[in-house]
Amino acid sequence: MGFIIGFLLSVFGYLLGSILFAKIVASYKGIDITSVGSKSAGATNVTRTLGKKYGALVFLLDAFKGFLIAILDRFYIDPSSLWFGIVMVSPVIGHIYSYRSDFKGGKGVATAFGVVFGISPLLALKMFLVWAFVFYLFRYVSLASITSVLVGYFLFLEGDFSTSQKLGATMIAFLILYKHKDNVFRLLRKEEHKFK
């Protein structure tokens, strides 16, 4: 029974994560978000292209995907089960590798934030504060996101979480950092665009 529930929640998480709200919101404005700006189907590109109001909407919708799956995960899956970690990762994988968009999508930050918020609101708050502080100092969204994810990840490892939850957090952190590799190189070359 545990296998069936874990499998079904993982599939549902991936399918839900694959709904790219950035594309949906931008399409209402007649824009293909994957062909403008960074071409990423995420909140940052929407903010740069359509403005803060639309960017905030996309962030909240993307975060809700992760939050909902995390709540279902906590309700149906034992935290010690390997399935807990798998379900945790599923909406982030769906968002980054959406089957609805040729297995391309966003970078997973908002969806991952939703997952963390669903598991530990306090940890999510700490991640947000780190993000806001770094962004305020340097005005780089990518640097703020990377720093927030790294700090959140190490806090997760030090926290009172199961091995499965920590494995899930490890996979999520790896995916997000991997998707930001080009940003890291641009930051090192001082070519990354600051957010005005």
Swiss-Prot record:
Acyltransferase recorded as keyword: no
Compartments in which it is found: Cell inner membrane
EC number(s) stated in the UniProt entry for this protein: 2.3.1.275
Pathway, per record: Lipid metabolism; phospholipid metabolism
UniProt catalytic activity: an acyl phosphate + sn-glycerol 3-phosphate = a 1-acyl-sn-glycero-3-phosphate + phosphate
Record's bilayer topology term: Multi-pass membrane protein
GO cellular component terms given for this protein: plasma membrane
InterPro entries: G3P_acylTferase_PlsY
Major site of localization recorded for this protein: membrane
A molecular function (GO) term: acyl-phosphate glycerol-3-phosphate acyltransferase activity
SMART domains (UniProt xref): G3P_acyltransf (SM01207)
GO BP: any one term: phospholipid biosynthetic process
Subunit comment: Probably interacts with PlsX.
Role of this protein: Catalyzes the transfer of an acyl group from acyl-phosphate (acyl-PO(4)) to glycerol-3-phosphate (G3P) to form lysophosphatidic acid (LPA). This enzyme utilizes acyl-phosphate as fatty acyl donor, but not acyl-CoA or acyl-ACP.
Name of this chain's protein: Glycerol-3-phosphate acyltransferase
